[in-house]
Amino acid sequence: MALLQISEPGLSAAPHQRRLAAGIDLGTTNSLVATVRSGQAETLPDHEGRHLLPSVVHYQQQGHTVGYAARDNAAQDTANTISSVKRMMGRSLADIQTRYPHLPYRFKASVNGLPMIDTAAGLLNPVRVSADILKALAARASESLSGELDGVVITVPAYFDDAQRQGTKDAARLAGLHVLRLLNEPTAAAIAYGLDSGKEGVIAVYDLGGGTFDISILRLSRGVFEVLATGGDSALGGDDFDHLLADYIREQAGIADRSDNRVQRELLDAAIAAKIALSDADTVRVNVAGWQGEITREQFNDLISALVKRTLLACRRALKDAGVEPQDVLEVVMVGGSTRVPLVRERVGEFFGRTPLTAIDPDKVVAIGAAIQADILVGNKPDSEMLLLDVIPLSLGLETMGGLVEKVIPRNTTIPVARAQDFTTFKDGQTAMSIHVMQGERELVQDCRSLARFALRGIPPLPAGGAHIRVTFQVDADGLLSVTAMEKSTGVEASIQVKPSYGLTDGEIASMIKDSMSFAEQDVKARMLAEQKVEAARVLESLTGALTADAALLSAAERQCIDDAAAHLSAVAQGDDVDAIEQAIKNVDKQTQEFAARRMDQSVRRALKGHSVDEV
């Protein structure tokens, strides 16, 4: 673990000066910004006291508006009013048009197939639109805190891939923001409730927003959140509750005409108001389009019951993917404004067998968790005189066949962190695997530092490549590395703990990094050679087993050709010519193709023997 001091060159750190940091929940429907003041995390309102900022931007030739003012233009100027841009982040134009065919925007493709939205302000990509939302949030924070932000933590869905995460970072950079970290939304919600410092175990985060539903199953271990499974429904949210209730009110009021947009809007507004009122009251009076009537909570529950059930089915699937049962869940965190609906809380509580956490405003909980994390990462710790950022100074990885190092966690990764990678067996019938944990930047084991060794035993004796071993590296906030190896089919596992930074000076770390740069080209060539030698050994091992089992399938001449090709491969594999080894491997493959086909036919005949066509 390295401690990096971040400060302006030539200036001493001001020990009592708090750095300004914010947490940003960049949402699909609404966004928020929060900060920590006087030890308390709070979301920041606009001049009218509104904490939510609609994630909508309206573009004109002479500028743009963000938020409520932009949303008011949605009906009149649809093509220039961009909303739900988060759905487009990191996706190709073809992907967007397939997933969301009814978007009302004029799209064009960039040279690399990425989406560009044709607006009055010109062609804009989703990154630019997101940047304008982030700028509005940053301006609100800077005004409230009376200063420029030193850093932000931005939340993203747990299922966001690398392209979507990079797009979010690019948007922040375009907005002039320094991103301390991207934080998974469910993790942020758990942090807001202080679960990161509580008991270890499984946590479920149930997130029902306006347009989407997400369920995340997390495991907390030694201060690190690991995402076990995610799921949900991208076409289910609180908006669906509103539309069902609006249709019900329409029926009760006897309104048949659906073409009047003004009446449509009036019905929807009445439905939203009724939904909110029914969270606290058993009945509510509705006055809309000349009709007056009463709606009960029971009627509302009947309308939305099937939708709530759909969310619980998604929860069940996520739990199954995570390999846990509802009773294994330690806490359930509620996120999203639609979780205020009493029926939602009741059904979720029944499903998990425990009362969900609802003390923090579900609209604000993600932003609050992000603010808490930002306050820590920017260096606002008690009694701290400088900004300390904990990072892994040298890459951590494993030795693989051929004396190679497979990096699992690259250097400069902020901690705590957990990463997993799958490996497999090299030989037929292999029942044990030696795990050699390495540290360093070079490609070969001989040039890196050995941290620890342990063995995983009890692997089922399968053909080479048949067993799958998941190796998980986990570094906690104190820099303690835990490595766990688990065979997937049996669940058998072994683990070890080590302190990677123990015994290393800053000079030694710098020297190891310098060597990795100086010998980069040489190391790549050495790795390529080692990889080809490993592949040659695997091919020869597999061929030997096949010949032992089914040599009778070959004529003497065919056997001689295969033996000659194998002997040549064995000979060149002792040398250092990468191309020669590669060509020899290809030659063995060519000479054994017919043999492989005969073995396959024989296996099929054996499998079908004694069975009728109908049985097959």
Curated annotation (Swiss-Prot):
GO terms for cellular component: cytosol. It comes from the Bacteria. GO terms for biological process: chaperone cofactor-dependent protein refolding; iron-sulfur cluster assembly; protein refolding. GO terms for molecular function: ATP binding; ATP hydrolysis activity; ATP-dependent protein folding chaperone; heat shock protein binding; protein folding chaperone; unfolded protein binding. Keywords: ATP-binding, Chaperone, Nucleotide-binding. InterPro entries: ATPase_NBD, Heat_shock_70_CS, HscA_NBD, HSP70_C_sf, HSP70_peptide-bd_sf, Hsp_70_fam, ISC_FeS_clus_asmbl_HscA. Coiled coil: none annotated. CDD domains: ASKHA_NBD_HSP70_HscA (cd10236). PANTHER family: HEAT SHOCK PROTEIN 70KDA. Chaperone involved in the maturation of iron-sulfur cluster-containing proteins. Has a low intrinsic ATPase activity which is markedly stimulated by HscB. Involved in the maturation of IscU. Belongs to the heat shock protein 70 family. This is Chaperone protein HscA. It comes from Salmonella typhimurium (strain LT2 / SGSC1412 / ATCC 700720). The gene is hscA.
